[in-house]
Amino acid sequence: VLPNMKKKPTLKYKGKKIQIIFEDSLIKNQTYIIVVNRNLCDERNVKLAQGIQFAFSTGNKIDDGSISGKIYNSKTGSAQLWRIADKDDSTKFYGRTPDYSMDASDSGYYKFQFLSPGNYRILAIDNSFSGLAIDPEKMLYGLHCDHSIQLKQMHNRKNINIYLPDKKNKIQSHILI
């Protein structure tokens, strides 16, 4: 469930039905996204080609912004997205768990849907580290060239492409070295 919650919900399933039990209280007027990642497979062990997203809201509308693009140089990439709260957060975002995570398709495409207006930072990482805070000393990652991605009401940002390098980088302020 995205954005990430302090306490993960409990899943109960029987047959074709899944029940999601929220241990945390939900924020008012917030759009939440239930993500089914590519690890889900059928009885023949065939995995999903792309992750699936379902949205619900605790308010009277579901947010409708989106950010999409391609991760280059990776067959197992994941896009990590942080909503930036303030100026200080714009340089320290990678030290906290991403607000949103989405596995890219085999061809590298990803799409975050149901996003609220605001400023976001995005990076690509191998999906084995998906959903984790970034440790620049231990993880390969790629940043988008824009310092932040501004999303307005009913706004779709396309072609937010990211190159995932072959060697480790270092985040220094907002510049990738």
Please identify what each model-predicted range represents:
Residues 50, 126-168:
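Structured interaction patches on ligand/partner-binding surfaces of diverse proteins
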Residues 170-172:
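Short, acidic, small-residue-rich periplasmic hinge/interaction motif at the N-terminus
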Residues 1-114, 119-121, 137-143, 166, ...:
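Acidic, low-complexity Ser/Thr/Gly/Pro-rich repeat segments typical of extracellular/periplasmic
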